[in-house]
């Protein structure tokens, strides 16, 4: 381990480790777990590791041979409330959105006109996705229906049209959840936090490691802060503001950037050595990312150099790309696509060393190519 990684492993305070892609983040997490257990600072049952996706959780499990809890936020919340007669809503929101457009919107003249105005700029399919995204964002950050009404009343023109439809669907959705006695994933985490805060449920965790912390929401943060308060636990946040991609599901990068507002005495460390790329590629990527002035400026160092590292190659069709490039690669290879449809468009046949994942599902994983 390099000096920065050693500092991170040895830190016993609340810590934010800013770890860029290729900096040995997972290696550092595994070594920290081993250090905490081997030195008898914490017992295995007292350590909790949280990551964002099932894929990243499974990746850590494969690399960690300790009997500790490694889970997602949602599975943690389910474990906390499992005896509370709690029922998940499933695809209720998708169903309500589709029903709204297929029945009510077609028969209600005013709503139909609103949709036609909006769809000058987008499609019905995209509009449905925007609405689902908005509601998830809204609920994940504790916003109330009154706030949404105020936003609607202050809006003008096309924004007001959007909000009218969102308000309709949001109200129907909340009523359906209440009448059926079900809850969505946002409610799941909120209620788990309440059970911990009110001392109704207890968990054994005294050291919490949160991977991909840049991808968090206020509801998730409050859940771990509740555990921290009740158990006097320490938290080891690991993340990189350059890699935040889950805004669509209610996540807020400001939590990462302003972590001292929530834990004033937190120690902030950085992993600045990149083992994956060359310096030229890193410099180009950083120049692009820093166009957003809200990002944390950091110097990333690499021992590799490569003249003109980026090449643009044009192919006549998608299948040619796979046939031309894949045979020349060694080790494990990941092909990333925008959605699952790309896997079939490219006719990708997965093997032990060749995997296809969407960009979102690949978050936090490591491959040779």
Protein language model regions, located:
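P-loop NTPase Walker
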Residues: 1-88
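Conserved helicase NTPase motor core
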Residues: 1-18, 158-254, 273, 364
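Inter-lobe coupling/hinge region of RecA-like P-loop helicase motors
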Residues: 1-21, 175, 265-273, 294-337, ...
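Conserved helicase motor "Helicase C" RecA-like lobe of SF1/SF2 P-loop NTPases
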Residues: 341-353
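Conserved RecA-like helicase ATPase core segment
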Residues: 218-311
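A short beta-strand element within the Helicase C-terminal
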Residues: 355-369
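Conserved SAM-binding loop
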Residues: 49, 70, 209, 237, ...
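ATP-hydrolysis module of ASCE/P-loop NTPase motor domains
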Residues: 85-168
